[in-house]
Amino acid sequence: MKVGVTGASGYVGKKVVKELQNNSHEVFKFVRRSVKNEHEIYWSPSKQEIDIEKFEELDAIIHLAGESIAPKDLLGFLPFAGGRWSKERKSRIYWSRKWASDLFVSTFESAGNFPKIFITASGNDIYGDQGDKVVT
C-alpha cells in the first residue's frame, strides 16, 4: 500500500513510518521544503499548496502534522516542543491544524483520484491512570 505521512519527522511520525516500512508499505513523507527524492511529497498548509499528482497516487494518508502540544521538558527528548500556553502558542496550535485540514478538504474535493483511507491525530498527551474518571 502507498501511504503518505504528514509529521513524519516528529516523535510519533518516525515510529509510524518505521512500522509501515517494516510491514512492507511504500511510505511517502509530506515535506514543506523542496523534495529530495521520489518518496517525498511537497505540501505547504499555510500557503494551501500540495503536489496533487503525488497525492492522487496514494492509497492512504496518516496525518500527524501540527504544532507540538508537549511540554518543553517532556522527559528531555522533545527540546523543540512546548512552552506556556500563551495566546500566541494556542494560535500556532490552532492554525497548524486548521490550515492542514483546509488543504486536505480542498484537495479531496478537487482530486480526480484520492486516497480511500484517511487517519488523523491532531495531538496527544499522557494522563496516567484516571480510574473511572472521563478524560477529554
PLM features: what roles do these ranges have?
Residues 3-23:
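N-terminal Rossmann NAD(P)H-binding glycine-rich loop of SDR-like oxidoreductase domains
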Residues 13, 70-72, 127-129:
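Glycine/Thr-rich phosphate-binding loops of Rossmann-like dinucleotide-binding domains
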Residues 27-28, 40:
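Hydrophobic anchor at the start of a short beta-strand
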Residues 30-34, 45:
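N-terminal Rossmann-fold cofactor-binding loop
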Residues 42-103:
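NAD(P)H-binding glycine-rich loop region in Rossmannoid oxidoreductase-like domains
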Residues 79, 85-91, 95, 99-136:
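Conserved Rossmann-fold NAD(P)-dependent oxidoreductase catalytic core, especially the SDR/UDP-sugar
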Residues 2, 26-27, 116-117:
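Residues at the starts of beta-strands that form the adenosine-phosphate
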Residues 6, 30, 61-64, 118-123:
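SDR active-site strand-loop-helix element
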